């Protein structure tokens, strides 16, 4: 896994994973699988933050580059929950794979602080599982894909056209490749 100067950076992660033991597919929820552990996501997110800060990618607001503590929440939820959130906040019906609610604005409201609150990230485990089957890869890879997409949105990355989307998807692949 990519390592730089982890000692100077911190991640403040509020992590929640629903109990999926009652789902019909036993391969969907396997206790002990790292994707259900807070420590796994802390390490992944810290790695990605290190990469982003070291490369000073211009797709992100300048003020994130002097922060040392990054705070966010990540919840792994079911289709019913993500459908409810999708309807309430996005005015869209039905489940989706990932939702992110960034707290970053174009202005730095944390100028004199060394931390930043990024926002909230929700991933539907059921959608991730369906997509992992559709794309013929592991649930872990799909969860990393969805988390990277939502995480980039939390950092202010948008995709308003095909070119921006392609750039974002390529950067997601790059971030995930650095975890190996």
Swiss-Prot record:
Co-factor binding comment = Binds 1 zinc ion.
Q: Name one GO molecular function term.
A: zinc ion binding
Major localisation: cytoplasm
Q: Which Pfam families match?
A: YbeY (PF02130)
Per the record, the coiled-coil ranges are none
Question: Known SUPFAM superfamilies for this protein?
Answer: Metalloproteases ('zincins'), catalytic domain (SSF55486)
Q: Which InterPro entries match?
A: MetalPrtase_cat_dom_sf_prd, YbeY, YbeY_CS
GO-annotated cellular components? cytoplasm
The catalytic activity of this protein is classed by the Enzyme Commission as 3.1.-.-
Q: Which domain of life is it from?
A: Bacteria
Q: Which GO terms describe its biological process?
A: rRNA processing
Protein residues bound to Zn(2+): 149, 153, 159
Q: Could you say which protein family the record assigns here?
A: Belongs to the endoribonuclease YbeY family.
Q: What does this protein do?
A: Single strand-specific metallo-endoribonuclease involved in late-stage 70S ribosome quality control and in maturation of the 3' terminus of the 16S rRNA.
Q: What is this protein called?
A: Endoribonuclease YbeY
Q: Which organism is it from?
A: Prochlorococcus marinus (strain MIT 9515)
Gene that encodes the chain? ybeY
